[in-house]
Amino acid sequence: LIQDQEINWRVSPEIRGSKSLKYKNESISISVIGARESYLSIQGYEIDQGAFFTERDDLARKRVAIIGSSVGTELKTSSKALVGEEVDLGGVTFKIIGVTKSEGSSGWSNPDEQIYIPLLTASDRVFGRDRVDSIRVEVPNTYTPEEAMISIERVLRREHDIGPGEENNFRINDWSQFTDLQKQATAIFSALLIGIAGISLMVGGIGVMNIMLVSVTERTREIGLRKALGA
């Protein structure tokens, strides 16, 4: 796909999984992403400290890693303090060479709580498999999402040797659709919170009004008696 003349776009194959991450006496379960050097720019992530791994690191299967901004906190330290330190990832020693800037949760995953390693390192040293889970593609603005998906499907069908009329053995997702859905869900959730807050205020107001009415009613005889006595 990378070398294909029809689609010369920036791509990053990915291998994903969960492994234990240990540093000194602390241990956590963490989401591991094995990817290419282009993954960072495709995702729009930035390095806060240190550097991202290079293509040379990938080809050499180097045991280097980049961590999200919250990983250090989970290990009872700070992510920046881990730069230059060695950690145990699934029984394999890695050197932390960088930390990403905080991105926040996307609803499906949280980049701040992940660890990123070179694709071939992940394949050979961590997961022991050469089958990728997904391929992330950065589509130029000159293409519409529909045009891009048609072109990608055509290339993948050819590479997978899928004949005419045969079903695809892969799935193509337009991430912008998920982004739109997330925005809609966030808007609905915000509206629900505002609605719940409004109901709470209304119920609270009724409660205060009832208390005031009860207080006045209970003191009616007392007030009448005081007036009769000239108070």
How does the language model describe each region?
Residues 28, 131-135, 168:
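Short amphipathic alpha-helical segments
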Residues 197, 206-231:
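Intracellular coupling helices
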Residues 136, 149-152, 163-197:
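Peri-transmembrane interface segments
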Residues 33, 37-53, 61-163:
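Mid-to-C-terminal secondary-structure elements
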